[in-house]
């Protein structure tokens, strides 16, 4: 009897488990087949990040270094052309030579080969010593330093009244000169007093007085002119160009020679009078 009861209990437990499993399967949410096919067919996106590679292209500093290196570098024995025009270390034209003959001459005289003119036909090369190449490179660097730097010109501004005292005007002139030496443009505005009648000529004389303190380095970039309905005057000073500096030095030297010549003429006349 006990055995029968145990069997009945086991069968009842199995039936309960089967019923629960069927109910769960019936109420479970099934995925949409369309969504499954869409997700399966959608490719994965690759995210690409742009990386800046190491290159001197577009880099002005890299280009300048490359140009300097190409402008005067030892070619060595890697001569791409078969026939080239050759100059010796003194600049004398040796004529057209085969590259094999050039290499033999280099080895014999212990010289280097430098490319001089690639646009000519055939290209022009020169035999040089190591010291000559070094001196030429130094000369190129000095020429690059002497070239004016490109970029916007900075302008300094100075404003003061027309009744400025001489001491203050000297101080302003020194400040302007310091700016001019640094290659700045200097805009100077002089305001006229309302209670005093002052002509444009008097204001212009102040500008000229400032300029006379530095005639060897400065000139007018914009000459004095009336502004603000005549209540002020303005001008712009700038540094002399190389050509203007040279012309100024030549004029000063010419004046000095004329002065010496006049002094010599005066002395000779005085000596003639004494002799008589």
Swiss-Prot record:
Gene Ontology molecular function, alphabetical: ribosomal small subunit binding; translation factor activity, RNA binding; translation initiation factor activity
GO cellular component, one term: mitochondrion
Predominant location: mitochondrion
Location of this chain's protein in the cell: Mitochondrion
Annotated keywords: Initiation factor, Mitochondrion, Protein biosynthesis, Transit peptide
Coiled-coil blocks: none
Positions of disulphide bridges: none
Domain of life: Eukaryota
InterPro entries (alphabetical): T_IF-3_C_sf, T_IF-3_N_sf, Translation_initiation_fac_3, Translation_initiation_fac_3_C, Translation_initiation_fac_3_N
First and last residues of the transit peptide: 1-31
Stretch list, region Disordered: 244-276
Positions of the propeptide removed during maturation: 32-94
GO annotation terms (biological process): mitochondrial translational initiation; ribosome disassembly
Entry annotated with the keyword Protein biosynthesis: yes
Biological role stated in the UniProt entry: IF-3 binds to the 28S ribosomal subunit and shifts the equilibrium between 55S ribosomes and their 39S and 28S subunits in favor of the free subunits, thus enhancing the availability of 28S subunits on which protein synthesis initiation begins.
Family according to the record: Belongs to the IF-3 family.
Name of this chain's protein: Translation initiation factor IF-3, mitochondrial
Source organism (scientific name): Mus musculus
Originating gene: Mtif3
């Amino acid at each position: 009897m006990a055995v029968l009861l145990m069997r009945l209990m086991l069968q009842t437990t199995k039936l309960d488990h089967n019923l629960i499993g069927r109910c769960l399967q019936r109420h479970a949410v099934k995925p949409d087949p369309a969504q499954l096919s869409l997700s399966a067919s959608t490719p994965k996106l690759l995210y690409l990040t742009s990386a800046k590679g190491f290159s001197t292209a577009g880099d002005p500093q890299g280009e300048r270094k490359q140009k300097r290196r190409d402008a005067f570098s030892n070619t060595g024995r890697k001569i791409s052309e078969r026939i080239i025009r050759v100059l010796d270390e003194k600049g004398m034209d040796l004529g057209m030579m085969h590259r094999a003959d050039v290499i033999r001459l280099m080895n014999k005289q212990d010289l280097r080969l430098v490319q001089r003119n690639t646009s000519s036909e055939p290209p022009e090369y020169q035999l040089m010593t190591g010291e000559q190449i070094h001196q030429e490179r130094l000369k190129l660097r000095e020429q690059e330093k002497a070239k004016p730097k490109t970029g916007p010109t900075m302008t300094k501004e100075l404003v003061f009244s027309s009744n400025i005292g001489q001491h203050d005007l000297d101080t302003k002139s020194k400040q302007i000169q310091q700016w001019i030496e640094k290659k700045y443009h200097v805009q100077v505005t002089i305001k006229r007093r309302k209670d005093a009648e002052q002509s444009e000529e008097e204001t212009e004389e102040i500008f000229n007085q400032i300029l006379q303190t530095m005639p060897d380095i400065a000139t007018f970039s914009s000459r004095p002119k009336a502004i603000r309905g005549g209540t002020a005057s303005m001008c712009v000073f700038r540094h002399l160009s190389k050509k203007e500096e040279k012309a100024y030095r030549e004029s000063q030297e010419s004046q000095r020679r004329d002065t010496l010549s006049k002094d010599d003429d005066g002395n000779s006349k005085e000596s003639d009078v004494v002799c008589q």
